[in-house]
């Protein structure tokens, strides 16, 4: 434990809060270009083929981001909008791709939670 005199001379060091999405650089979203689109398997209790994309952002960061929803139209040079938000069962995936914006289409035939998947309101019969 420091003495009062030591605290007067040096002071306490403020703990820096580490960002959970450093590549965003305090932006809500970032634009990027897909460099690779592939599937990967989740951590232990779960089993699936999760769709992910490696994206080079406009600020130079290369990140792995998750493509939510059923089906997608992404290819290698697609331009996408990326937001923060990790996927708990995919290590290293700390970002999501925004559906229905830029080159990524919304989920087809989506009736519920449409705003999260960029789906337009269905036409009345």
Swiss-Prot record:
Region: Disordered, residue numbers? 9-31, 106-125
Report one GO cellular component. small ribosomal subunit
Point out residues bearing the modification 3-methylthioaspartic acid.
Answer: 89
Q: Which GO terms describe its molecular function?
A: rRNA binding; structural constituent of ribosome; tRNA binding
What does the entry give for GO biological process?
A: translation
* Stored Gene3D superfamilies: Nucleic acid-binding proteins
Which PROSITE patterns does UniProt cross-reference here? RIBOSOMAL_S12
Q: Which Pfam families match?
A: Ribosom_S12_S23
| Keyword tRNA-binding appears in the UniProt entry | yes
* Keywords, in A-Z order: Methylation, Ribonucleoprotein, Ribosomal protein, RNA-binding, rRNA-binding, tRNA-binding
Q: Where is the composition biased (Basic residues)?
A: 113-125
Please describe the quaternary structure of this protein. Answer: Part of the 30S ribosomal subunit. Contacts proteins S8 and S17. May interact with IF1 in the 30S initiation complex.
Q: What does this protein do?
A: With S4 and S5 plays an important role in translational accuracy.
- Give the family, as the similarity comment puts it: Belongs to the universal ribosomal protein uS12 family.
What is the protein's name according to its record?
Answer: Small ribosomal subunit protein uS12
Recorded source organism is: Polaromonas sp. (strain JS666 / ATCC BAA-500)
């Amino acid at each position: 434990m420091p003495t009062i005199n030591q605290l007067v001379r040096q002071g306490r060091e403020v703990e820096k809060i580490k960002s959970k999405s450093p590549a965003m650089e305090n932006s809500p979203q970032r634009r990027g270009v897909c460099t690779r689109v592939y599937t990967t398997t989740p951590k232990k209790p779960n089993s699936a083929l999760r769709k992910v994309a490696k994206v080079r952002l406009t600020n130079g960061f290369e990140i792995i981001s998750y493509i939510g929803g059923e089906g997608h139209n992404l290819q290698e040079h697609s331009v996408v909008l990326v937001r923060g938000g990790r996927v708990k069962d995919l290590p290293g995936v700390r970002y999501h791709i925004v559906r229905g914006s830029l080159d990524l289409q919304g989920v087809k035939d989506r009736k519920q939670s449409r705003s999260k998947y960029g789906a337009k309101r269905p036409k009345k019969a």
